[in-house]
Amino acid sequence: MGLDSLPPSRSTCWILLVFGTAVLAAGCGGPFLVFPGGALRGEVVTEPVEDWSFADDWFVDLETRPSDPYSVELNYVVKHRDLFLDPAEGRRWFDYIREDPHVRVRFGDKIYPARVVLVGRPGELEGFPPDRFVYRVESRTE
């Protein structure tokens, strides 16, 4: 029996799965499931957004750190036409928005330049987890 007739080992299957997922993530123009990405790809919307209530996806793609883009897929909240993010401590993207509030958000294939503004510290705002900071996303032109 030759080596080429042996079934692949479990570790080989896992390596192929991880590699395949990484290749998919690299080609999607942003984050992929739980894997962070780089610069978001899509149509950049230059008109300011006054009302974010059109956002009805489960997740938003958030691009941080304009000098070396880092993007993640995350939950969001729309309240009274405003878009809010509530990062947990220890998230890399949370550190990045503290350093530079300029971000871009993507819903579908549309990208909106924005900046984030801290509006609440843990426990200050009703309707958000008590251990989270709360940021409002404000539209900006690039």
Per-segment meaning from a language model:
Residues L3-L16:
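Bacterial N-terminal signal peptides that target proteins for export
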Residues W14-A25:
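Bacterial N-terminal signal peptides
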Residues L17, D51, E63-R65:
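Residues embedded in well-ordered secondary-structure elements
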Residues P31-V34:
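Juxtamembrane/interfacial segments flanking transmembrane helices
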Residues G37-W58:
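Post-signal peptide N-terminal segment of mature Sec-exported envelope proteins
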Residues T46-V49, D68-Y70, G90-E142:
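Short, structured beta-strand-loop surface elements
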Residues A55-E89, R115-V117:
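Short beta-strand segments
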